[in-house]
Amino acid sequence: MALFRRPNWSALFEKIFIQKSFLGFCSLRVGCEIIIWFAIINKVSGLYGIVSLFQNSDASPWQVLMYVSSVLMLILFSWLAIHIPKSSVPHALILFYVYLIDFLLNVLFTVLFALSWFSKLVQSDSSSTEESADSDPSPSLLYLFFQAESIPSLLLLIFFASLKFYFVLITLSYSNKLIVDSGIRPQNLPPNFSGRVTRLLMKPYIMAANRSYLRNHTKRFTDSIELEQRLMDEVV
């Protein structure tokens, strides 16, 4: 008898990351629709950012990149808002990839702007203490980061980052549900443009995310064969 069992990574991934509903009472499809409209409202601010670039020439390259990416994401989310209610597997996968990229970009921009803001606090505080030679050394960036005034801002950043990560899991779970329910297999897709796009979208999803739909599809297929066999036996 083996002392150690090889962990079932696919089942563990499904148990931790695959959600059954949105907030415990809404379906995944309704959750994805809500997520898309929240994203559209959020990305509208990118339009105002583009306008502000023409009025302010002091914008950093990161700000320009953030505003441009917001406009591109606004276009993509507006397009996906039309197709997600139709329960389309390719569009559900596109939503997952787009929202994941948007989440990673938001984390990157948040970290960059937070570091820039706190570094300016350090510089302003150190310049105010330069007049006194015997004064204590200026506080470090880590000290200002965890000051009482900064803790609420830090908690808000963590809350919204956690909420967006949960939204990423919802989009992943919705695409997983559509794949499982439809029983789509990459090798069975048609050779047309739509089939090639769907196969391309499913390839990284299968490799890196979850292969449980293959197991579920096989189990469902086996159960249907057993049911047909029992019915045939009863008829005979």
UniProtKB/Swiss-Prot annotation:
Q: Which UniProt keywords apply?
A: Golgi apparatus, Lipid metabolism, Membrane, Sphingolipid metabolism, Transmembrane, Transmembrane helix
Q: Which superkingdom is the protein from? A: Eukaryota
Localization per record: Golgi apparatus membrane
A GO biological process of this protein is: sphingolipid biosynthetic process
A cellular component annotation (GO) from this entry: Golgi membrane
Q: Which InterPro entries match?
A: Kei1
The record's function comment reads: Regulatory component of the inositol phosphorylceramide (ICP) synthase which catalyzes the addition of a phosphorylinositol group onto ceramide to form inositol phosphorylceramide, an essential step in sphingolipid biosynthesis. Helps the medial Golgi localization of IPC synthase in a COPI vesicle-dependent manner.
Protein name per the record: Inositol phosphorylceramide synthase regulatory subunit kei1
What is the scientific name of the source organism?
A: Schizosaccharomyces pombe (strain 972 / ATCC 24843)
